[in-house]
Amino acid sequence: MKSTQSFSAVAGFVRLPKSSLGQVRYYSILKDMSIPASKQKFIPSSGTYPKGFLVAGAHAGVKESNTRFPDVALICSETPCSAAAVFTANKFQAAPVQVSKQVLETRQGTGIRGVVVNSGCANAVTGKGGLEDAKMMSAKVDECTGTPSADPQNTSTLVMSTGVIGQRLPIKKILDTIPTAHSNLASNHSAWLTAARAICTTDTFPKLLSRTFTLPSSPNRAYHLAGMTKGAGMIHPNMATLLGILCTDVPISPSVLNPLLTHAVSRSFNSISIDGDTSTNDTVALLANGAAGGETITTTSSPDYTAMQTILTNFAQSLAQLVVRDGEGATKFVTVRVRNSPSHADAKVIASTIARSPLVKTALYGKDANWGRILCAIGYSQGIAEGTVVPERTSVSFKPVDGSEELKLLVNGEPEAVDEERAARILQDEDLEIVVDLGGGEKGDKGLGGEEGVYWFCDFSHEYVTINGDYRT
């Protein structure tokens, strides 16, 4: 008898029918690179990009199943850049992480010409051979840009890789593709979007943003900032997260570039969680070529530095939030805000603990206002100062996205009579904010202090398990 089984595509994956064993494999096969309708709104139709940067994406076929989509990206500057990066704290640091660290240390953050990225294979836990592969990628880009070094330890290109851990790169494919990508370098929006696509793995949409701004010393001069990032799973950062490349045409001294990036990352990429895992490859790099001219930012005490710090941090937060919105199988974007803590660090630890809790995440997926799970996570938060969490002073509420009054769940340790119908309506929305107050709640007593910590995270769904169960296929 002819099968009447039906298939449907959701979020770029094909939904499979029940197997003969009665099990359901929800989203097991990548359908194509089409972008889900719900994600289209996050993709820019145009952009204003920093002067002097050229980008491209090209197809190498790093994964054999990828027969046509770009999986190698180049981001190059026409002139040498100042550069800084933050890297994963995972002990098994991937080969590209080690090579990029070496490039920055050898050059002391100067003379950097660009970044080469491949998706489909992480080149992590691949031994000496993997290290040589990463070095060859860097050297190949230098060769294409006309800046080859006689010393293989002194290349000028950073390297990033993302994909399956424990497998060697098909290095010949990548080295053969780098010249093709170089020949396609361009500065237009299409080129930036193609490069952003090339670094994706299980992402359902490319993550790209750009901004134009001014600085106090040059109020009539336009500066630009652009960034791309990738990530949808294995995301819970520690010193960095995912892959991110930020480029600006502001002239910035290498000595202040690192504190600029570290501050921005600590309040953005280090404040998101999808599944609690910290990758072996996490890298966020910032390149500044000074092509827009004006005064060079050389000290952390200058008005330009202060302004740039705010601009970069806000920009990085917007990029990081796109990663959460593309969490594997996610249906919710959740902000957790912990207020009135004695320190920012303790507030962030508590927010992070809530964001990592599988019970909190699954309750939100089920649209269940089970605030006891939030309290439980607050209570077992590790490494915070004694007396930070006092049950009798703790309040929890849901803050709706429509601007209406917060739904109070717990006030000063006392449970509220929760309007379950209103709670259900709030949890129907894609966006939600959880507010935890460690001070005096509605009594207005600030109690322990006024520091705040924020984390962004998503829920856990059936699809997350299936996507990751089938990752290597």
From Swiss-Prot:
| Catalytic EC class | transferase
* This protein's GO CC annotations: mitochondrial matrix
Alphabetical keyword list: Acyltransferase, Amino-acid biosynthesis, Arginine biosynthesis, Autocatalytic cleavage, Mitochondrion, Multifunctional enzyme, Transferase
Q: Where in the cell is it found?
A: Mitochondrion matrix
The entry's protein name is: Arginine biosynthesis bifunctional protein ArgJ, mitochondrial
Assembly information from the UniProt record = Heterodimer of an alpha and a beta chain.
- Please report the organism this UniProt entry assigns to the protein: Blastomyces gilchristii (strain SLH14081) (Blastomyces dermatitidis)
The yes or no answer to whether the keyword Acyltransferase is present is yes
Q: Which InterPro entries match?
A: Arg_biosynth_ArgJ (IPR002813), ArgJ-like_dom_sf (IPR016117), ArgJ_beta_C (IPR042195)
Domain of life here?
Eukaryota
